[in-house]
Amino acid sequence: MIKVLETEPPKKLILNIVEWFLLRHDLTETKVYVHPLHNMNCWGEAEQICEGEYRIKVCTNQSLRDFVATVMHELVHVQQWETGVWKGDGEKEAEKRQYKLADEYWKGK
């Protein structure tokens, strides 16, 4: 289940991005709640609410490409929690994959 706590235009884009990622990584049973916020002290953050359930906050005050990459970055953290596989705090992997995933999303891969 994916829930975007927003009624503005990014809602459809966010739903599509999260659905694409979860399907691609076989995480369709995972629940993700996304909170797009105009002002944050960072670009995005993710937290585990409970097993299989996550909350992502993402700043909308950035370019479209950076916004998509930020959502992907936080979804990599969701994947890390779900699989139990990461090194350190998982940031290096998320940073390495965020723009690659964003570009693959835009290219429809």
Language model features: what each stretch is:
Residues 10, 14, 68, 72, ...:
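Hydrophobic (often cysteine-bearing) scaffold residues that line and stabilize catalytic clefts
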